[in-house]
Regions:
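Long, compositionally biased, glycine/small-hydrophobic-enriched stretches that function as flexible linkers
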Residues: 1-153
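General structural signal for secondary-structure boundaries
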Residues: 1-5, 149, 156-161, 293, ...
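Short, mixed-charge, low-aromatic patches
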Residues: 82-87, 141-144, 191-197, 232-235
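Short, composition-biased local secondary-structure segments
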Residues: 96-103, 152-163, 233-250
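Gly-rich Lys/Arg/Thr-decorated short loops/hinges at beta-loop-alpha junctions or inter-strand turns
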Residues: 104-115, 136-138, 168-169, 213-228
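Short, basic, glycine/proline-bearing loop/turn elements
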Residues: 112-116, 170-175, 261-263
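Extended, well-ordered protein cores
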Residues: 122-176, 187-194, 204-206, 211
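Glycine-rich phosphate/ribose-binding loops and adjacent secondary-structure elements
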Residues: 176-186, 192-306
């Protein structure tokens, strides 16, 4: 991909665990650079043509204020006196999606050196992946799934990007996949003791999770979401004081932002837009996740040639 996009390429030494964080960092930085270049190309495309810029706006939901402004421009036509100003405003609002990274926390095997001696704990698979992400240039989120790994969560405290800067921004946010409210509280409190804040709880039912079942108490998604809706305020109330205490112990400034709330999202088993709207309106979730056929993407998985 470096060759394809004309980027300089330097081979990273080391096999297996050696060099893995550096390779992960280099890969993520490359993806970010490709996205930035493609975004710039998209912005440079003309309006009123059948191109990727039109496709970008067409894919936005009808409720989007950006799509409404775009539709106004198209309806006014080429000769619109405000065309240049509106086009500039629209181009400024075109943004790329977040390049998020997922770690299945239980996939954390111990690695060995060439003499078959076990490497120290910071060289386990999940920690190497975390280090690679933490040292990348990305401003995005890391998603932890498949359970809780306390040593991995504790390892995050080595990287400043997971903490607030002086204006209250967090460069690398934390998303936790959880199966119930109790799990959200337990994991959220553990992270809070390290000064780490959960940006989003991604709720997934063990009975209806779109492709893989896992052990649970057998509660249907509606029951899980009802509890989150009723107890949502507890998430901020219980975590924030613990986080602030950690910052004080480090002598760091803790800058808050207006209207800060932990996001609640849900994924799995959503079949149509009506179901999405019901989940958002009835249970107050901030977003929904739909299945993607990632196993058919050559860059994501090894697949047989047709």
């Amino acid at each position: 991909y470096c060759e394809k996009h004309g980027f300089p390429y330097e081979r990273i030494k080391g096999k297996g665990a050696e060099g893995r964080p550096e390779r992960t960092t280099a890969y993520l930085n490359m993806v970010s650079r490709i996205v930035d270049e493609n975004l710039a190309k998209l912005k440079s495309l003309p309006f009123f043509d059948e191109n990727d810029k039109k496709k970008y706006f067409d894919l936005l939901p009808d409720s989007s204020s950006l799509k409404k402004k775009y539709s106004e421009l198209i309806n006014k036509g080429h000769e619109c006196s405000e065309r240049s100003q509106i086009e500039d405003e629209l181009n400024k609002e075109i943004k790329a999606g977040s390049i998020d990274v997922n770690i299945m926390v239980k996939l954390d095997k111990i690695n060995y050196d060439k003499n078959k001696e076990a490497l120290s704990s910071e060289f386990t698979d999940a920690k190497l992946a975390l280090k690679g992400y933490a040292e990348s240039c990305l401003k995005s989120s890391i998603i932890f799934s498949a359970g809780i790994n306390q040593t991995l969560f504790g390892y995050m405290s080595n990287f400043k990007d997971f903490y607030r800067d002086e204006v209250g921004d967090i460069k690398k946010k934390i998303i936790l996949k959880v199966s119930d409210f109790r799990s959200a509280l337990i994991q959220g409190k553990f992270l809070a003791k390290k000064g780490l804040e959960v940006y989003e709880f991604r709720i997934e039912s063990g009975l209806n999770c779109g492709g893989h079942a896992f052990p649970s108490n057998g509660l249907l998604l509606a029951s899980l979401l009802k509890e989150f809706k009723e107890k949502r305020s507890q998430l901020k109330e219980q975590f924030a004081p613990i986080v602030q205490k950690y910052y004080e112990s480090k002598g760091w400034k803790y800058t808050t932002r207006e209207n800060e709330e932990v996001l609640l999202t849900v994924q799995g088993g959503i079949g149509n837009n009506g179901e999405r709207l019901r989940l958002m309106n009835e249970y107050g979730v901030d977003a929904t996740g739909w299945a993607t056929p990632f196993l058919l993407v050559p860059e994501a998985t090894g697949i047989d040639a047709p």
